[in-house]
Each structure stands twice: as structure tokens, then as C-alpha cells.
């Protein structure tokens, strides 16, 4: 879907023409011949809609994950014959014709475990294996075992997995890291990209592209051999994100690619479908109905694209933070996504060089340099003094500060003077007693205040350290770890997100109850434990007092959340 072509730009960015040919060639490579599995809303048609609208299950994901016991076409035919008969019981029909997902056994950790021991004991509990799946299962098979987040998330998730893998590496489970990289490479080879998760209903979108960083992580253990082995899959994933770029005119967008008026190429989040999400069917229909001034398909696409961002949902995507139906994800150019694309280009350059292809390495370096200039030009708010998203409708950088602003520092794409300003903005506006706030807006959405998420804590910590801003980086780690430890001491679990306005409380908001487990929290906690404790005195719990070897700061008072961006 291309936007209307505006007036021609005065000056186009100069990028070698051979690179566009490279995109086209890689796009052809990424096209797969395998039949794409159909999601349950397509397989089951009106039956799926009726079951979800009947709200037979508290969680809409339950029926999306149910496995038909026979050919869905036969089940649908039976349903059409029986549904209008007197005494028809929809719940009984579902129970007869589907195998519902089993609730995972409640994990009861042994008494007296330290935080580190608890996490190390969870890795086998969270490991799954699905080499083979039922014919009509929404679960997609993967060749190697993998670690799931936990709770209702019974499948592997793309960007979650990177932070989980950091913890696996910290625990010495390099075999599991290698298995998960192999699985994601398999998905790229099979579907042309890494889906949101290994479910058929996730195939229409991806998530924040961390695959190249996963390969880079594996290369810490296996050397350049890992970079060379997975170079073809990294190239295919890059082609997926840049699909359609060779035909774009200035001022147009195509799927995940945006070409601005001066020819700058950036990316956005996008889902190929514009229908309600099967796993949140009723909620999406209600959101679309609540705003009759917008086409429902437009709202569905933006809801799905927000899910692709990993930030589902946040005031970041919304015109009115209190109204989800005002989100417009596809008209926003995200600072975190483009930072990850920059990092992907840099790793592709490194891998190409390792493979002996210096010409291709130079092309990826050219792309990375062009994107870095685009980030500095379009994704920096000079008036506010922080990185932010770019608005395709207003043609301006947005004003809202979010934790995504730390991504340019995380991938070493930021100018040094801007990194210093980001440290100040982070400490002033986002740092709380229990860690880093996602935004400073209280919207009731889970990717807003007062919630803090493990991956964003790690991105901020690493990013600030990259630019010598160690004091703020250590503040973030210490405050978040204290929160994790206090919650663990009380509840004996690690959770998906935390309330950072204080310590010892799990986060709230969103479409489902708080989940425990939890893959990425486990991974980030292990990394941070090793960061704050001296190497000669590693710690298994968060120390009662902050280690003296690091800078100390005064306790933070809770900052007031802002009502609007």
C-alpha cells in the first residue's frame, strides 16, 4: 500500500544504485515456496468469530491456541448444520471438536533458593520442544528446543528471546543459545522472516529485529564462524524489512519501509493483515467500534502493527493517551526500530567482511552510515533534548520521551553530545525508585507509566555505559534489581513487568493479567547481577546495600506522571 506521491524532492540522498539491486536480489531470495499455514480465524471462519464473541474463555488466546481434532472444513460444516438446532451448546461443540491448551503446571521452587539459583532452575522449566505439531495446530514446529517467556505465552517470541538468550549465555547454556539461533534461522528460511511468535496467527508480522544481535551474541562463543554461517539468513531478514524499497518514490511508504522527502530511508512497524487479531479478537473489535470516524481495517492494522513493535500498547502510538482507538502506529517512524536496523546493517557489514566479501561489506556500511544520518536528522528532538519518533502525518519529530530513546545509544548510533543530553533526560524524567519508566504518561496501557520492563532497563544501562554515562546506567540497574529482589523475596517469582514507582510490585495494565516466569526478566537480572557485583565477589542475590565500588546516589522520590505526552 503506497501513499500518494507528493511533489518531487529538491535533493535526493545519494546512495549507490547497486544497493537497490542488492535489495531486489535479496527480496527474491526471501520468497519461499512453502505453503504458509493459515491462522485459525481463516481456517474456522464464522465458527471462530462466534466462539470468540461468546467469550467462552477468559483469555481470547485460549481458543486461538486450541487444536482442531479433525479437518477444520469438516468441523465448520458440522457447525453450520448444528448451530440453529434447538439445544445446541456451543461450549460442548468446542469441547468435542477441539483440544484446548493445557495449563502449565505451577512451578514451586525449592525453599531457600537465591535469586540466581531460582533463575538457573527455571531454564529447564521454560524449555519447550515442538519438532512436530498437529496438522491444524496454530503452533509452528521448530527443529530445536527453545525457551518460552512463561505464563500464557506458550510459544517462543522473537524479541523476548534475545534478552532470554543473554541470561542463557550468562548461565553457560551456549547450547540453548545456539538452538534458538538455529530455530530463528529456520523460520527465516521457511517463511521469509521471523514471525512475532511461532503461531500461524503471528505470521503476518515480525517484531523488533534482534536476529543479527543474536548471531553476534553467539559469535562471542563460536567466533566469526557463527557470523558466516548465518549471513544468508541475516540478509534475508534485511530484505524482508526493506521489501519494496526499490520502487519507492520520495514521500512514499511501502509495508515496513519509509522514504522521506530528501530520499532518507527509514523503517516502520507493519502487519500484512488488517483484521482483528485472533488472540485478542473481541478486544480489537470493541476498539474499532469505539471510533466510528475511522475505518475498522485501519484501526486493526495499527493494533497489529503496535503488536509488531512489542509495545502493545502505549501512548507512544496514540493521539489521545486515554483512547486506544486513536493509535496510528503505521504513521510513526520509531527510533528503536531504526536503531536496530542500523545495528543490523553494521553486523551485516561485519559478517560480509568475515565471509571475504569486502564489496558487500562496504555496501552495508554505506547503508548504516546513511541511516545514522537519518536518525540524527529526523529522530532527534533538539528542542526537548532527546531522541524520539518521527510523525509522518505532521512531518515532525514527536515530543514524547520514552525509554525507546535510549536505543541509539545502545547500538552506538548517537552523537556524543546527544548521549550526554539523553543521560540528563533519563535521570530527570524516566528514572524511578524501582527502575526506568517506559514513558512518563499514565494511560492504563502496559507500555506506559508506572511500568518498567526488563529489556528496556538493559538497553538503557548498556547504552549509557557505551557513552561513559556510568552513574546513570548503574542507577537504573540498581533500582531495577532492587525491585526484582523485593518482589522475589515476597512472591518467590520473577514477573513480566514491574511497577517502578516503588519496589516490590509487579506491573499492571494491558489486555491480560500479570505473567510470571519470566524469560527476559530472568536474562536481564543475571546480566545486571554481574554488572553491579565485583567480579572477585559475584553475588547470587541483590546485596542489601549498594556495592561501594560503584557510584552512590540519593534515593529517588517518585516523580509525578504526566497526564499527556
Swiss-Prot record:
Its EC number is 3.2.1.28. It is found in: Periplasm. Its main location: periplasm. The active site is at residues 312, 496. It comes from the Bacteria. Residues 1-30 form the signal peptide. This is Periplasmic trehalase. It comes from Escherichia coli O7:K1 (strain IAI39 / ExPEC).
Amino acid at each position: 500500500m503506497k501513499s500518494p506521491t507528493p511533489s518531487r524532492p529538491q535533493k535526493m540522498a545519494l546512495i549507490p544504485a547497486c544497493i537497490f539491486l542488492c535489495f531486489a536480489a535479496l527480496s527474491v531470495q526471501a520468497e519461499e515456496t512453502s505453503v504458509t499455514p493459515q491462522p485459525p480465524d481463516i481456517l474456522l471462519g464464522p465458527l471462530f468469530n462466534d466462539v470468540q464473541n461468546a467469550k467462552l474463555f477468559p483469555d481470547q488466546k485460549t481458543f486461538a491456541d486450541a487444536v482442531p481434532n479433525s479437518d477444520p472444513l469438516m468441523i465448520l460444516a458440522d457447525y453450520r448444520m448444528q448451530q440453529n438446532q434447538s439445544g445446541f451448546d456451543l461450549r460442548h461443540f468446542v469441547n468435542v471438536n477441539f483440544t484446548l491448551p493445557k495449563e502449565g503446571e505451577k512451578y514451586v521452587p525449592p525453599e531457600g533458593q537465591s535469586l540466581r539459583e531460582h533463575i538457573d532452575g527455571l531454564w529447564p522449566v521454560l524449555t519447550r520442544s515442538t519438532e512436530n505439531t498437529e496438522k491444524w495446530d496454530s503452533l509452528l514446529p521448530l527443529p530445536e528446543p527453545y525457551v518460552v517467556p512463561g505464563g500464557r505465552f506458550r510459544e517462543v517470541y522473537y524479541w523476548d528471546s534475545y534478552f532470554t538468550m543473554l541470561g542463557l549465555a550468562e548461565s553457560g547454556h551456549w547450547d540453548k543459545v545456539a538452538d534458538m539461533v538455529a530455530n530463528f534461522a529456520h523460520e527465516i528460511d521457511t517463511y521469509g522472516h521471523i514471525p512475532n511468535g511461532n503461531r500461524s496467527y503471528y505470521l503476518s508480522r515480525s517484531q523488533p529485529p534482534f536476529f543479527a544481535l543474536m548471531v553476534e551474541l553467539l559469535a562471542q562463543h563460536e567466533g566469526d564462524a557463527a557470523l558466516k554461517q548465518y549471513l544468508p539468513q541475516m540478509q534475508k531478514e534485511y530484505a524482508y524489512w526493506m521489501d519494496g524499497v526499490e520502487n519507492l518514490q520520495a514521500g512514499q511508504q511501502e509495508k515496513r519501509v519509509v522514504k522521506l522527502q530528501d530520499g532518507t530511508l527509514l523503517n516502520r512497524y507493519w502487519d500484512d493483515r488488517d483484521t482483528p487479531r485472533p488472540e485478542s479478537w473481541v478486544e480489537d473489535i470493541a476498539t474499532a467500534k469505539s471510533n466510528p470516524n475511522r475505518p475498522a481495517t485501519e484501526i486493526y492494522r495499527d493494533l497489529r502493527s503496535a503488536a509488531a513493535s512489542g509495545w502493545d500498547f502505549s501512548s507512544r502510538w496514540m493521539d489521545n493517551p486515554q483512547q486506544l482507538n486513536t493509535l496510528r502506529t503505521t504513521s510513526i517512524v520509531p527510533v528503536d526500530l531504526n536503531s536496530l536496523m542500523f545495528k543490523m546493517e553494521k553486523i551485516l557489514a561485519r559478517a560480509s567482511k568475515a565471509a571475504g566479501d569486502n564489496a558487500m561489506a562496504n555496501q552495508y556500511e554505506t547503508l548504516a552510515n546513511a541511516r545514522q544520518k537519518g536518525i540524527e536528522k529526523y529522530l532527534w528532538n533538539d528542542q526537548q533534548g532527546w531522541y524520539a519518533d518521527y510523525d509522518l502525518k505532521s512531518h515532525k519529530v514527536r515530543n514524547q520521551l520514552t525509554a525507546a530513546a535510549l536505543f541509539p545509544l545502545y547500538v552506538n548510533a548517537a552523537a556524543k553530545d546527544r548521549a550526554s543530553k539523553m543521560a540528563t533526560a533519563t535521570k530527570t524524567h524516566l528514572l524511578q525508585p524501582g527502575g526506568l519508566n517506559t514513558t512518563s504518561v499514565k494511560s492504563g496501557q502496559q507500555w506506559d507509566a508506572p511500568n518498567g520492563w526488563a529489556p528496556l532497563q538493559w538497553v538503557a544501562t548498556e547504552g549509557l555505559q557505551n557513552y561513559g554515562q556510568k552513574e546513570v546506567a548503574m542507577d537504573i540497574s540498581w533500582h531495577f534489581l532492587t525491585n526484582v529482589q523485593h518482589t522475589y523475596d515476597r512472591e518467590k517469582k520473577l514477573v513480566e513487568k514491574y511497577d517502578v514507582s516503588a519496589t516490590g510490585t509487579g506491573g499492571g495494565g494491558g489486555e491480560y493479567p500479570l505473567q510470571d516466569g519470566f524469560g527476559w526478566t530472568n536474562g536481564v537480572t543475571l546480566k545486571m547481577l554481574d554488572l553491579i557485583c565485583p567480579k572477585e565477589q559475584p553475588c547470587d542475590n541483590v546485596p542489601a546495600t549498594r556495592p561501594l565500588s560503584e557510584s552512590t546516589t540519593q534515593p529517588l522520590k517518585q516523580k509525578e506522571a504526566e497526564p499527556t505526552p
